[in-house]
């Protein structure tokens, strides 16, 4: 489960994922919902943003299936393909769009800091990802470090610098994890 809420406006997001790994392979199904409140929502008339509304043609949910594969422990590159198959990811004519996202991740460590390099692409036209053809939409470098607070508690901090060449945009995400 993952969620977020912007302080300055009405946007909020709740994502629920069920995943299973077997050997080098993994599968996942994720329910994304990020429509937030109707107030100030430019899509409020097109979808029913009630979290518990699950009609495929009017829901604000996006349901995605994903497959991933990790090459090996010695070369830990992972490859994932995710496709929206149900919900709000629609073409102009109302048909399902099947927007897809492919991501390569390579974890490594430098001086006790866990790092992860990411390349993400949208392989074809997708209104959801805002691209009309193949596009690189995610170049990122993430870092994680456990900060020892006491002999029995460490606080995992993380930072991620994200570039989106397709939209000429960038983001910085900072946070901590509670276990």
What are these regions (language model features)?
Residues 1-54, 133:
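Surface-exposed loop and membrane-interface regions of Gram-negative outer-membrane beta-barrel proteins
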Residues 10-14, 21, 59-63, 94-102, ...:
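Residues that define the transmembrane beta-barrel architecture of outer-membrane proteins
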Residues 106-108, 141, 168-179:
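Outer-membrane beta-barrel "beta-signal"
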Residues 10, 19, 28, 72-77, ...:
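Short loop/turn motifs that connect adjacent beta-strands in outer-membrane beta-barrel proteins
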Residues 10-12, 36-41, 86-92, 126-130, ...:
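Outer-membrane beta-barrel proteins
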Residues 116, 122-144, 148:
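A C-terminal functional module that forms or caps the active site or interfaces directly
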Residues 45-126:
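Detector for outer-membrane/organellar transmembrane beta-barrel domains
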Residues 1-7, 27-35, 50, 76-87, ...:
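Transmembrane beta-strand segments that form the barrel wall of outer-membrane beta-barrel proteins
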């Amino acid at each position: 489960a993952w969620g977020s809420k912007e302080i300055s406006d009405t946007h909020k997001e709740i994502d629920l994922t069920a995943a299973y790994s077997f050997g080098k392979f993994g599968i996942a199904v994720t329910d994304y919902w990020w429509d937030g409140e109707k107030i100030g929502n430019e899509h409020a008339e097109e979808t029913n943003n009630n979290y518990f509304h699950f009609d495929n043609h009017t829901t604000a949910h996006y349901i995605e299936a994903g497959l991933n594969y990790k090459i090996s422990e010695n070369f830990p590159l992972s490859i994932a393909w995710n496709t929206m198959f149900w919900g709000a990811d629609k073409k102009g004519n109302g048909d399902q769009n099947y927007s897809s996202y492919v991501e390569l991740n390579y974890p490594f460590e430098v001086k006790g800091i866990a790092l992860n390099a990411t390349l993400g692409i949208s392989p074809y036209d997708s209104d959801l990802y805002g691209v009309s053809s193949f596009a690189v939409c995610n170049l990122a470098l993430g870092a994680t470090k456990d900060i020892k607070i006491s002999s029995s508690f460490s606080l995992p901090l993380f930072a991620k610098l994200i570039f989106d060449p397709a939209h000429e945009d960038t983001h910085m995400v900072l946070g901590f994890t509670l276990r």
